[in-house]
Amino acid sequence: MQSTGVIDRFLDIFARYIDSGFGLISGDVGFLASSLIVIDVTLAFLFWTWGEGEDVLARLVKKTLHVGFFAFLLTNWNALAKIIYLSFSGLGLKATGAGGAEDLLHPGRIAQVGLDAGRPLLDQASALAGPVGLFTNFAEIAVLLLAWAIVLLAFFIIAIQIFVTLIEFKLVTLAGFILVPFGLFGRTAFLAERVLGNVMATGVKVLVLAIIIGIGSTIFDEFVQ
């Protein structure tokens, strides 16, 4: 696991730097949210004052719920993003009967599964090889080595894809943390809607990868045994 653990270490370094960004920009995001709330509420108050025959109380309740919803999102954004990730990955792995969602946070384990799955092929090729066997069983050895390389390459590609997807998800959530406050003001709400859609789209990508990993891990676990 030492050789494949470097992937997890790189992921941990990237994740720590990205997660620290939430704390570094939280003050600026709070100021932006407060400014947009003041602008939105001020404009709404002016329209209510000039309007005739409008239900001010109903509009006030609606505006309060709207602001409260986005305040909840901003306060718990990082935790909610992790819940979304674990939910999508958990559903994908549960659909295939594989491990827990936390396993998907360690792409090095996926690479290790590939090494374990390919070891019987390598052992069989070694058993066929010898002073004379290398020439008499050349075709069988070549096929086994090719199969071992394909299995190894497939799992390493999936591990790298998981690494990239995790980094992408964290970067999207960090960008979302900056853009979500724009949902507090009607004229800029489209920015928040777009980033929320991107978070969900990245979550679906995690779900698909989890299903692929779950199926592959199950098949090759049986193969190794």
Task: Cite the ranges covered by each PLM segment.
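Hydrophobic alpha-helical transmembrane segments and adjacent short intramembrane/lumenal linkers
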Residues: L144, K170-Q225
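Alpha-helical transmembrane segments and their helix-start/interface "positive-inside/aromatic belt" motifs
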Residues: E54-L73, W77, E193-K205
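Membrane-helix interfacial "entry" motifs
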Residues: R16, S20-G27, G51-R59, V132-N137, ...
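Binding/recognition "hotspot" determinant
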Residues: M1-L36, L46, D55, S89
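Hydrophobic transmembrane alpha-helix segments characteristic of membrane transport
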Residues: V41-T64, I150-L153, I157-F190
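Hydrophobic alpha-helical transmembrane segments
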Residues: F31-L43, V143-V151
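Short amphipathic alpha-helical coupling elements at transmembrane boundaries
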Residues: D12, R16, R59, K63, ...
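Non-cytosolic segments of integral membrane proteins
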Residues: L73-L171, I211-Q225
